[in-house]
């Protein structure tokens, strides 16, 4: 007999103004409890989704986010909590905005492609410049067009960076080092990438021929969906010390944010792994609550193959963002008749939003090696952590939070509290409030474009009819999401950026 909404809510316990606990029993076989972070505005969305599901008993679509967080807590080898960040919404298997860590020393511990997502190493990078808003405003339309001309965008877009089959093999294994070798990146860019832009366990042999075929023409392309390149202006500085370390010292300074991932290649790596893991689950008798949570023991051949292929796709995504950085620097140099160097177009940081990584964490009084899955969530390591660059040792790792089209973005920094509560993880963006299909039904793309124009935002878009899927109305309020993380102490606000021009697929 299905439980009523009231019965379901009896398993959810408020821990603080910004956190709830999901008690064992909410779904079967939970190994650990769940936890999610929300404020009062986001709380209504989360509970309404559960209420609607209880009424309809889950006809079609994904499970509610809170159920997905709990189902992840039932996976073998999970430790700590299954954590939902404030931008959490339902996704394939894991919710988007879900973090889960698995103890590598436990033979039953698993890796799940649904915990990384189809767009492996979808992520964001932020470049600063020495330009002011007043320098850009007179040439804003020309600059937006120059970016649109330089960066290939849209669903089937093909790259302009020359790449043969051998180059692709190298890029899959070398990441940003390939971009450096080929002259598409600056040496300092590598320092300011998560993992220094290269996952060493990558093995191009574990990326299928079909995935490579999809990836070969797409290098240096933005893709569609919520991917974008955005010219932004510093709107607010909350932490002057951290901002100065990032080269941001006043309001009105111009930055560029690039949001993209591993395109069709990453999607194929995930698809291939899910097929292999279904078989491995039968063989190893792994039981899960939701078949979308297909997984394999970390130490199994399927688990290892996926981790090596995923690392290759992650490296491809870093090369992709590096290539677009190269094209962005060219676009700016052309419009301002200068050089990227003279424009001070330095990379502040590059973070991943969809990835699984082996990390050392302190848990139950001892150091443990964990496989941390972050899907729609961002690594946020604290000051003095050995894995963050020298430049940010005193501030904590920069965390880049992209808003939705036409809304603000934020730069946060990692904290010690985040390290203990969420294994050094925070939110990644606004998080969807309306499905893509609902957005298309409810919103008119011309209204969305006019709204952006009224805000003084130039837009160049390859598929105007897809614009309403990415309209601000389709998403949660990014400020609510960021403020929740800030008040929970799992990351701290440093800088707020507002858009003045957007390039989209």
Swiss-Prot record:
Required co-factors: Mn(2+)
Database matches in Pfam families: RtcB (PF01139)
Domain of life: Eukaryota
Active site: 428 (gmp-histidine intermediate)
Keywords: GTP-binding, Ligase, Manganese, Metal-binding, Nucleotide-binding, tRNA processing
GO MF: GTP binding; metal ion binding; RNA ligase (GTP) activity
Subunit (UniProt): Catalytic component of the tRNA-splicing ligase complex.
HAMAP family (alphabetical): RtcB_euk
Name recorded for this polypeptide: RNA-splicing ligase RtcB homolog
Organism the protein comes from: Nematostella vectensis
Taxon lineage: Eukaryota, Metazoa, Cnidaria, Anthozoa, Hexacorallia
